[in-house]
Regions:
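Conserved ABC ATPase signature
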Residues: 149-153, 157
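Helix-to-loop junction immediately C-terminal to a conserved catalytic motif
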Residues: 60
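Conserved ABC ATPase "signature" region
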Residues: 76, 127-144, 253-254
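ABC ATPase NBD coupling module
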Residues: 21-23, 77-93, 119, 239-244
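Short catalytic/signature loops enriched in Gly
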Residues: 2-7, 25, 234-276, 280-293
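Conserved ABC transporter NBD signature motif
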Residues: 68-76
Length: 293
């Protein structure tokens, strides 16, 4: 798909090398080139160790790249530091896999969401308090959540609170790094639906990172497939089955199909067992009626 707009984020030949003991090195990222366009959701999929989380940490400046460029709105932000970096982090937010690791256990949820609003001088006082309640409602949490501590929330509720904090500063880009993988399937689906809704409403660009191809395909416009630190293929989500050419992408697709087939088989067996149970119950009821008569 051709894009008429300029990319909001561009990674040019991004490399990240880790130095290990014994003068050994590991190339976590190898000349990665990717573009993210305004309003787009770019999925990044790959197995553990493929480099996808390293990529997210480099984009958000939690890690320094070894070489290459990170360009935001056509400006090189690769080596930002100090106040400039702090301001840049407002524009590129990140939602991690484990929300519990982000919270201060002694800070209530309301204060947690309000904190960046105050720190970035977006609003203050009563206005910030009202904004917290609005954000909670937007992610499907009640107003009473503001007075709760992190340990009083479920994993899904914690992730919703983290998302509320991230969208509160009105960033241009949000990175979701395995943001639903620690949740059970039903809660995961609710969070994915929330992300789709928020994207439609706000127009925020996003990068959704996961090892699960089916999940990535559900929320993304395009999918970048990473393998051993490289982007081996970028395909349109809607054309994945017909356009994917790389053997690794094909293997991911095959594993997704096998998992789906297994789920369908388990579901069919469950339904069959329930039907048999109902039939047995009906027989018991008929027998009881005949005996009582």
């Amino acid at each position: 798909m051709a894009h008429e707009e300029l990319p909001i984020l561009e990674l040019r030949n991004l490399c990240k090398t880790y130095e290990l003991k014994g003068h050994r090195t590991v190339d976590a990222l190898k000349a990665v080139h990717l573009e993210l366009y305004p309003g787009e959701c770019l999925g990044i999929v790959g197995e553990s160790g493929s480099g996808k989380s390293t990529l997210a940490r480099c984009v958000t400046h939690l890690e320094r790249v070894t070489s290459g460029q990170i360009r935001y709105r056509q400006q090189d932000i690769t080596r930002l530091n100090g106040k400039a970096l702090r301001q840049q982090r407002k524009q590129i937010q990140m939602v991690f896999q484990e929300p519990s690791a982000i919270f201060n256990p002694r800070m209530k949820i309301g204060a947690f969401i309000r904190e960046p609003l105050i720190n970035y001088k977006i609003m203050k006082g009563q206005q910030a308090e009202q904004e917290v309640l609005r954000l909670l409602g937007r992610v499907g949490l009640s107003a009473t959540t503001a007075d709760k501590y992190p340990h009083e929330l479920s994993g899904g509720e914690q992730q919703r609170a983290v998302i509320a904090r991230a969208i509160g500063v009105e960033p241009d880009i949000i990175l979701f790094d395995e943001a639903t993988s620690a949740l059970d399937v039903s809660i995961q689906q609710q969070i994915l639906e929330l992300l789709v809704e928020l994207r439609k409403e706000t127009g925020i660009s996003s990068i959704f990172i996961s090892h699960d191809l089916a999940v990535v395909q559900q929320v993304s416009d395009r999918i970048a497939v990473m393998y051993q630190g490289e982007v081996v293929e970028v395909v349109e989500s809607s054309q994945l089955t017909s356009s994917a050419n790389h053997p690794y992408t094909r293997s991911l697709m095959a594993s997704v199909l096998s998992v789906r087939e297994m789920k369908h088989k388990v579901q069919a067996q469950k339904q069959e067992a329930e039907q048999e149970q109902e039939q047995e119950q009906e027989k018991v009821e008929v027998l009881q009626e005949s005996l009582s008569g």
